[in-house]
Amino acid sequence: LRIDRTLKAETDPAKALQAVGAVTLGLDLTLRDLQDDLKKKGQPWERAKAFDGSCILADWVELSEIKDWKDVHYTLHVNDELRQKGDTALLIFDIATLLADISQVFTLEEGDVVMTGTPAGVAALKADDQLTMTLHGQSQDFVWKTFVQA
């Protein structure tokens, strides 16, 4: 979710949702070996989460393409094999409620990105893996292809 206007302490989920300007799919990558090593040492994990290329974002899709926030499906294929399948109907908290709750804790500013979670299917990627992310919109599908760089 791309935030297009400041959102602070909003208690009305419908109003919170109005701060969203566009949606996309993203991959929030983790260097698991480094993360495990940092955990064993009792150190923070940010080096395993914040590295060059650690957050792949597809192109933004305008909200006019999303008619029903409760019926958005998305998939990730790795080398043409289905790896992850998600659906906004399966989120613990709907998107509007999630945004309102976040805005109670800290201010969301224009340009901020909110990622809503990861469906089952997390697994290691290898150099040159071909990734296909698909956002199944109500009027059309949006497909992005990329690959894992060494």
What does each model-identified segment do?
Residues 1-105, 109, 113, 122-150:
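Catalytic-core "active-site belt" of small-molecule-metabolizing enzymes
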